[in-house]
């Protein structure tokens, strides 16, 4: 009884409206991978032609002149959307994640993860997973520059780094730099240098 | 209405009592009589309906993490995902191809977009002013917007000028992209 509508994995609209989002090139690739039947129905049978104008989508009655105008505008939109995406990707790839180990009292320290906001990661959720994964306290706080960062209690910078690497890889952002800074003095090493070797 | 909408606009989120859920269901059927045959499929008795109160007195009703319909004042308005499941139940108007682009960016629908050859309006006596309509597009199968008639469909045909439908919810707006998790 109920109808089931396929939604495009790229722009989340029903595939017949993909042409209006300016992401049609990627939408077409997605649809071709996921629903061949619908793809053939919407775009015709030529499977290789990803760039071509959707012939069957274009059937309409608004007259040739207006149709042409519409097409032009859509192309413009597509170009704009694509350049925007590229910029975004470049921004993502050039930014980096900083994992900083900071001293608390005595032998305690905490780990601050900054620079995640570019990657559309839900900080609160990440904090929650950290808290349960490492069995520590973990929260989201704002730093001096009013940017959000995840604060994890405990000396677990390496584990956090490994997790973030995995997370970024999952998002297809493998090339992103993850940097570890140690702002706290390591207590273990200091005694060996200060105390004279037993002799 | 959902130009700007995010999780921050949520005030409370509570379960709906089953008695209230029943009355909501009957209200839905009252508004859209054709829903009666499928209402139990769309909203089974055992499901946990949630009410989400948001700023601007908007209330969303959700099952699981899918918003099914919402309410600003009196009438219940279905979301597009809900409409897509059973489009026959709702009064529908059709716009021409030239208008799709504007509607998808949230514009109100102008009368000429509803009266040209690619568009379609229900036959006389048509729909009254202020009724909720599903907006479909030429050569498209699925609805692209939900709107409210600013004048009756007969007026749209005769006056054919100015705003005809106020767009409440359209594909790709914040409510469409909204997820509860």
From Swiss-Prot, chain A:
NCBIfam families given in the database record: DRP1
Domain of life: Eukaryota
Family: Belongs to the DENR family.
Domain SUI1: 97-168
Name of the molecule in the record: Translation machinery-associated protein 22
GO biological process: one example: translation reinitiation
Entry keyword annotation includes Oxidoreductase: no
An annotated Gene Ontology molecular function: translation initiation factor activity
Protein localization: Cytoplasm
UniProt source species: Eremothecium gossypii (strain ATCC 10895 / CBS 109.51 / FGSC 9923 / NRRL Y-1056) (Yeast)
Subunit structure as annotated in this protein's UniProt entry: Interacts with the 40S ribosomal subunit.
CDD domains registered for this protein in UniProt: DENR_C (cd11607)
Disulfides per UniProt: none
Record's keyword terms, sorted: Cytoplasm, Ribonucleoprotein, Ribosomal protein
Any single Gene Ontology cellular-component annotation: cytoplasm
Domain characteristics, as noted in the entry: The SUI1 domain may be involved in RNA binding.
From Swiss-Prot, chain B:
Location of the PUA domain: 90-172
Keyword RNA-binding appears in the UniProt entry: yes
Source species, domain of life: Eukaryota
Cytoplasm among keywords: yes
GO BP terms, alphabetized: formation of translation preinitiation complex; nuclear-transcribed mRNA catabolic process, nonsense-mediated decay; ribosome biogenesis
Entry's localization field: Cytoplasm
GO molecular function, one term: RNA binding
Any Pfam family matching the protein: PUA
Any Gene Ontology CC annotation: cytosol
Entry keyword set: Cytoplasm, Protein biosynthesis, RNA-binding
Gene3D superfamilies cross-referenced by the UniProt entry: 3.10.400.20
Main location: cytoplasm
PANTHER family, per database record: MALIGNANT T-CELL-AMPLIFIED SEQUENCE 1, MCT-1 PROTEIN
Protein family per UniProt: Belongs to the TMA20 family.
Subunit structure as annotated in this protein's UniProt entry: Associates with ribosomal complexes.
Biological role: Involved in translation.
Name of this protein: Translation machinery-associated protein 20
Organism: Eremothecium gossypii (strain ATCC 10895 / CBS 109.51 / FGSC 9923 / NRRL Y-1056) (Yeast)
């Amino acid at each position: 009884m109920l109808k089931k509508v396929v939604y495009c994995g790229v722009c989340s609209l029903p595939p017949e409206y993909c042409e209006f989002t300016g992401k049609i090139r990627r939408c077409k690739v997605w649809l071709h991978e996921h629903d061949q039947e619908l793809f053939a129905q919407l775009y015709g049978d030529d499977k290789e032609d990803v760039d071509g104008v959707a012939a069957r989508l274009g059937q309409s009655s608004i007259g040739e002149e207006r149709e042409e105008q519409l097409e032009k505008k859509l192309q413009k939109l597509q170009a704009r959307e694509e350049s925007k995406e590229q910029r975004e990707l470049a921004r993502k790839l050039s930014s980096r994640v900083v994992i900083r180990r900071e001293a608390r009292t005595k032998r305690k320290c905490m780990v601050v993860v900054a620079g995640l906001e570019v990657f559309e990661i839900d900080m609160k959720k990440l904090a929650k997973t950290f808290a349960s994964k490492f069995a520590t306290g973990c929260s989201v706080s704002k730093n001096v520059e009013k940017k959000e960062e995840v604060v994890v209690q405990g000396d677990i910078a390496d584990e956090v780094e490994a997790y973030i690497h995995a997370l970024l890889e999952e998002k297809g952002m493998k090339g992103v730099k993850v940097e570890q800074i140690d702002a706290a003095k390591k207590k273990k090493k200091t005694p060996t240098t200060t105390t004279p070797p037993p002799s | 209405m959902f130009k700007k909408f995010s999780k921050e606009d949520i005030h409370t989120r509570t379960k709906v009592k089953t008695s209230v859920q029943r009355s909501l269901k009957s209200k839905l059927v009252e508004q859209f009589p054709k829903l009666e045959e499928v209402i139990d499929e769309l909203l089974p008795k055992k499901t946990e309906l949630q009410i989400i109160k948001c700023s601007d007195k908007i209330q969303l009703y959700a099952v699981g993490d899918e918003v099914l319909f919402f309410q600003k004042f009196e009438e219940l308005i279905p979301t597009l995902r809900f409409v897509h499941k059973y489009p026959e139940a709702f009064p529908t108007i059709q716009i021409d191809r030239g208008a799709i682009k504007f509607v998808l960016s949230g514009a109100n629908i102008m009368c000429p977009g509803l009266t040209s050859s690619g568009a379609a309006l229900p036959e006389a006596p048509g729909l009254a002013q202020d009724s909720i309509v599903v907006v479909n597009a030429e050569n498209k199968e699925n609805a692209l917007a939900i709107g409210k008639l600013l004048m009756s469909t007969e007026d749209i045909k005769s006056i054919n000028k100015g705003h005809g439908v106020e767009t409440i919810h359209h594909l790709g707006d914040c409510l469409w992209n909204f997820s509860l998790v």
